[in-house]
Amino acid sequence: MLTVLDTCYLLLRGWGDAVRHPLNHAMSQSSSISIKCPSCGREQEFTTWSSINVSLNPEKKNELRNGSLNRFTCESCSESSEVNYPVLYHDPDKKFMVWLNGEDADIRGLMAGDFLDEYHLRLVNSRNHLVEKTHVLEMGLDDRLLELFKVSMRMGDKSIPEGDLLFAGVGSGQNDLKELQFAVVSEKETKFIGAGFKAFEEFAVTFQPMLEAEPLEAAKWVQVDQAYAKALLQRHLPQNSD
């Protein structure tokens, strides 16, 4: 019997043979587990997806983004809760993979090889960050540059609310000008803000040399987030590390 928070090790344990060969891990993989409702205690089956290939199963992309892929709803009391478990998101067309809760070094070692040299391989630690990262890479944006830009936004605009600053897409802002759109997610609320796309392009010209000075190793899994960006800035701009 599993509770909502007990699923990670079980799913990781079954990865061994499946991730050794590219043809195997390219396929979407699901399994059924028994979960005990945290509210009423009733047990019921729940389908988890340890790997989703959005070319083979495009509907899973929307299920991830609207939360239904991770949502457990009790058939008895209708209580809903989020089930956190490892998910490998694979987009073979855009050539990227994003791994939620891929923390085990031995498992990550299995997910390597020359066939991944052209892939962007990213690690994230929450569903929100998984959704954000898929948005960024799907649009062909450099996620390292975007994380640096988010740090710059925080430093330059103290009016940005407290919370997790997440990229939400590209759209039109004031005067129909193209802008990057962000969600600021906190425990209390979610607010949306924009930043001019032209400002982002100018930022890219300035900071691209910094990224070129530290190219990412091919076929290596890396967690590109705010901590990554701040560490990069500290190495190259130590006088601004505060």
Residue ranges: model-predicted function:
Residues 21-22:
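Short, often N-terminal, low-complexity regions
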Residues 25-101:
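N-terminal cysteine/histidine-rich coordination modules
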Residues 94-228:
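Long, contiguous alpha-helical scaffold regions
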Residues 226-242:
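Charge-dense, extended regions
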